[in-house]
Curated annotation (Swiss-Prot):
Residues 1-15 form the signal peptide. Keywords: Cell wall biogenesis/degradation, Disulfide bond, Glycosidase, Hydrolase, Secreted, Signal. One of its GO terms (cellular component) is mating projection actin fusion focus. Its main location: secreted. Coiled coil: none annotated. The gene is EXG1. Transmembrane segments: none annotated. It is found in: Secreted. GO terms for biological process: fungal-type cell wall beta-glucan metabolic process; fungal-type cell wall disassembly involved in conjugation with cellular fusion; glucan catabolic process. The active site is at E213 (proton donor), E313 (nucleophile). This is Glucan 1,3-beta-glucosidase. GO terms for molecular function: glucan endo-1,6-beta-glucosidase activity; glucan exo-1,3-beta-glucosidase activity. Disulfide bonds join C296-C419, C321-C347.
Length: 421
């Protein structure tokens, strides 16, 4: 498909928090603004993350120096043939029809966010990545239709990496902001919008996320904002009114109030917030009351934002103790193993629920419940990160439900109204 040109933007207008409605004549497939999103991410499926599926990386040995740090190096080290063999088996088994059925019928959730890399749709010359994900994505969307679950297609990695995180496909690089890489990303959005934004998917795909977690402080907001605008019009010129999802790029709440508004000629825009409190020593030093106060504060701040907003990633984690959470070869900040951190307390036993004290369990439950309340008060719902892992307890939705840390059903409360909303 030939990429359409970016339409000139309408003049800027002062935006204020209003009750947004879908553009007349458009069909979103989900009533943002009046219906809440209750979802899970299908992390580690089409974009590898070592902390979610460590077994794929541990196959390289016990020495971290010999373990690939991301999917780029995973495929490069194995070569195309072997990488395709291993990953095809992973794609076929990590998420099955049983999972989508359980998400809908057991957990009573209404949406899945599906991270996928640009390489699933279009490779760059010399890319080591392998393809084949698209067929499994299509199969998953068929299961979503069967069980009444909505989906976001989330471009989790773009060429050169938008943040340097391993979950972008390429760790420790920030090479996305050049014309060729951005154009390749737009071409991928054009393809996704033309296929998954078409009428036959309108009842399932209710969001196309242009890029996951672009690191605004590192790559600059000018590049990101221009890409968001061009990506929006690329989706619209593909003939799709599907909601366009933009990530907050790690900016303060209300930063985007005057950006891509209906007054400026944009419509069906959703803002995606990701909230964690474990990726700095200062956050880890907070006690449970301070963690919850931060959650409540974020919820209040977000409640005044202009756009529809979803808290598209968050977790129960109160530590960064999970193996490889900070990356292959990097230990936790909590015990001082991470470069530049300092010892606060031990990680011993944090990954085994059997070793948790009743206080540990109660504090984690309180933290989850506060977030559920805040993300619904401050926004239009939430999507938990992530549905399943091999052994990352604090991040694993299913294990947390099984062990009474995540409420089941999700509206059950042992610690109601912690924020006083």
């Amino acid at each position: 498909m030939k990429l359409t040109k970016l339409v000139a933007l309408a003049g800027a207008a002062l935006a204020s928090p209003i009750q947004l409605v879908p553009r007349e004549g458009s069909f979103l497939g989900f009533n943002y603004g009046s219906e809440k999103v209750h979802g899970v991410n299908l992390g580690g499926w089409f974009v590898l993350e070592p902390f979610i599926t460590p077994s794929l990386f541990e196959a390289f040995g016990n020495n971290d120096a010999n373990v690939p740090v991301d999917e780029y190096h995973y495929t490069a080290w194995l070569g195309k043939e072997e990488a395709e063999k291993r990953l095809t088996d992973h794609w076929n088994t990590w998420i099955t029809e049983y999972d989508i059925k359980a998400i809908a019928e057991n957990y009573k959730l209404n949406l899945v966010r599906i991270p996928i890399g640009y390489w699933a749709f279009s490779l760059l010359p010399n890319d080591p990545y392998v393809q084949g994900q698209e067929a499994y994505l299509d199969r998953a969307l068929g299961w979503c239709r069967k069980y009444g679950v909505k989906a976001w297609v989330d471009v989790h990695g773009v060429p050169g990496s938008q943040n340097g995180f391993d979950n972008s496909g390429l760790r420790d690089h920030w090479d996305w902001p050049n014309a060729d890489n951005v154009q390749h990303s737009i071409n991928v959005i054009n393809y996704i919008a033309g296929k998954y934004g078409a009428p036959e998917y309108n009842d399932i795909v209710v969001g196309i996320e242009l890029v996951n977690e672009p690191l605004g402080p590192a790559i600059g907001m000018e590049v990101i904002e221009k890409y968001f605008q061009e990506g929006f019009w690329t989706v619209r010129h593909a003939g799709s009114d599907t909601a366009v999802v933009i990530h907050d790029a790690f900016q303060e709440k209300n930063y985007f109030n005057n950006f891509m508004t209906t007054e400026q000629g944009f419509w069906n825009v959703v803002l995606d917030h990701h909230q964690y409190q474990v990726f700095s020593p200062g956050e880890l030093a907070r006690n449970i009351d301070q963690h919850i106060a931060e959650v409540c504060n974020v919820g209040r701040q977000a409640s005044t934002e202009y756009h529809w907003r979803i808290f598209g990633e968050w977790s129960a984690a109160l530590t960064d103790c999970t193996h490889w959470l900070n990356g292959v070869g990097k230990g936790p900040r909590l015990d001082g193993s991470f470069p530049g951190s300092y010892y606060q307390r031990s990680c011993q036993g944090r990954g085994d629920i059997q070793t948790w004290s009743e206080q540990d369990k109660q504090e984690s439950r309180r933290y989850v419940e506060a977030q559920l309340d805040a993300w619904e008060h401050g926004g239009d719902g939430w999507i938990y990160w992530t549905y399943k892992t091999e052994n990352a307890l604090e991040w694993d939705f299913r294990r947390l439900v099984d062990n009474g840390i995540f409420p089941f059903p999700y509206w059950d409360r042992q610690f109601p109204n912690q924020c006083g909303f």
